[in-house]
Amino acid sequence: MIWHVQNENFILDSTRIFMKAFHLLLFHGSFIFPECILIFGLILLLMIDLTSDQKDRPWFYFISSTSLVISITALLFRWREEPIISFSGNFQTNNFNEIFQFLILLCSTLCIPLSVEYIECTEMAITEFLLFVLTATLGGMFLCGANDLITIFVALECFSLCSYLLSGYTKRDLRSNEATMKYLLMGGASSSILVYGFSWLYGLSGGEIELQEIVNGLINTQMYNSPGISIALIFITVGLGFKLSLAPFHQWTPDVYEGSPTPVVAFLSVTSKVAALALATRILDIPFYFSSNEWHLLLEILAILSMILGNLLAITQTSMKRMLAYSSIGQIGYVIIGIIVGDSNDGYASMITYMLFYISMNLGTFACIVLFGLRTGTDNIRDYAGLYTKDPFLALSLALCLLSLGGLPPLAGFFGKLYLFWCGWQAGLYFLVSIGLLTSVLSIYYYLKIIKLLMTGRNQEITPYVRNYRRSPLRSNNSIELSMTVCVIASTILGISMNPILAIAQDTLF
């Protein structure tokens, strides 16, 4: 009898929870319409996978790409609408959040074509890969709009767990398994540190979890200048440093880049940065409004360390993926300048603009690496020697993307860095900008070293990998080449049309 009553109570409680969730989705679903499209795409993928006998079908790629494109379209139609807080304060919709969501969706849309031929060659499961990519994208989008500490943590873990699973996607590869374990342990530790910082904010604000309410709670409890805030700031900055691969919290990055499948590395190298930047700008600017000098100093130190260590260590690398890992550490150091500058001197606008350029430059480089790796089976930098003699299009594409990453004019990377450094100089960050300029020159050295190898024509330097290289046809239907071409064109011409991009980025104030 008692069990029967308890069972009825459980059913009633479950029904109430379900009805409340359904009510929230019914009345607030329009505010997360782009996310709902991705959820529908995920369900459709699962249904087709369960009911279809032929697993390797173009339908999976079509559904994934279509859901991402429709989600981008829905996001663009919602642009310039008034900021809205929905789901009882858990989710916020505004231009600032939406532009980061757009960048995440753009990354995912460009990354899926990179994976098609790779998955076919490695004979890995298609559905799992696409499910993890879409779920990670969904987690990143919710992270961009999360308005309270609990939603931030849940969205962050949704993104992180899918990232761990993607890095270990090739289960038979020992290096991939090793990279996954390191990524999982370091990611779990960083999440714990971040949540510990959140707990300090929760306690000091009198039990508030919404970002703006935390500020009001700190004012009411008179704790906004207490030592506890400094402790919370340190723990949250360390947690964010791991997520952003800022030095000295970057140790996991090279191993994960080298061991994970190359399309996965391409995906994680941009989406994780965009999602973590969206979180960092809001979590530092809103709850730590009264501690701006302190977190500015912390970020300056981390940015300087990242720019110097990232670029110095990149010079010594022999693996292309490890070199790009250290290069990305230096690149995120430049981006941090925009966060430190803030809204006062278009810091956020310069950060968003440079991230758009970085997506095209980085994904273009990884597309070239994926293509070369599939045709030769190597990742060693020396094995690229003489590639221009066999595949001029691939060699020129890689050279353009590397030069853009280095910041040489008239490519997009030059204009992005120029505006970022100019905003930092206007804000009085003279030492930080000087370090950025010096390390940018340093980065050009190791990029040019690779380009010199690509263009060499001396037979004694050309490795057997390039001698036996399979030349691609002039007109290829390869999806990797399609994605590579889009990224190379964007890396070349986006800087010339920078003014409208800046105007859009300047509308993203939150």
Curated annotation (Swiss-Prot):
InterPro entries: NADH-Q_OxRdtase_suN/2, ND/Mrp_TM, Ndh2_N
Subcellular location: Plastid, Chloroplast thylakoid membrane
Catalytic class of the enzyme: translocase
GO molecular function annotation: NADH dehydrogenase (ubiquinone) activity; quinone binding
Topological category with respect to the lipid bilayer: Multi-pass membrane protein
One Pfam family per UniProt: Proton_antipo_M
Keywords for this protein: Chloroplast, Membrane, NAD, NADP, Plastid, Plastoquinone, Quinone, Thylakoid, Translocase, Transmembrane, Transmembrane helix, Transport
Swiss-Prot/TrEMBL catalytic activity: a plastoquinone + NADH + (n+1) H(+)(in) = a plastoquinol + NAD(+) + n H(+)(out); a plastoquinone + NADPH + (n+1) H(+)(in) = a plastoquinol + NADP(+) + n H(+)(out)
Transmembrane residue ranges: 24-44, 59-79, 99-119, 124-144, 149-169, 184-204, 229-249, 261-281, 295-315, 323-343, 354-374, 395-415, 418-438, 484-504
GO aspect biological process, one term: ATP synthesis coupled electron transport
EC numbers for this chain: 7.1.1.-
This protein's GO CC annotations: chloroplast thylakoid membrane
Similarity-based family: Belongs to the complex I subunit 2 family.
Subunit (UniProt): NDH is composed of at least 16 different subunits, 5 of which are encoded in the nucleus.
Its job: NDH shuttles electrons from NAD(P)H:plastoquinone, via FMN and iron-sulfur (Fe-S) centers, to quinones in the photosynthetic chain and possibly in a chloroplast respiratory chain. The immediate electron acceptor for the enzyme in this species is believed to be plastoquinone. Couples the redox reaction to proton translocation, and thus conserves the redox energy in a proton gradient.
Identification of the protein by name: NAD(P)H-quinone oxidoreductase subunit 2 A, chloroplastic
Organism: Zea mays (Maize)
Taxon lineage: Eukaryota, Viridiplantae, Streptophyta, Embryophyta, Tracheophyta
Originating gene: ndhB1
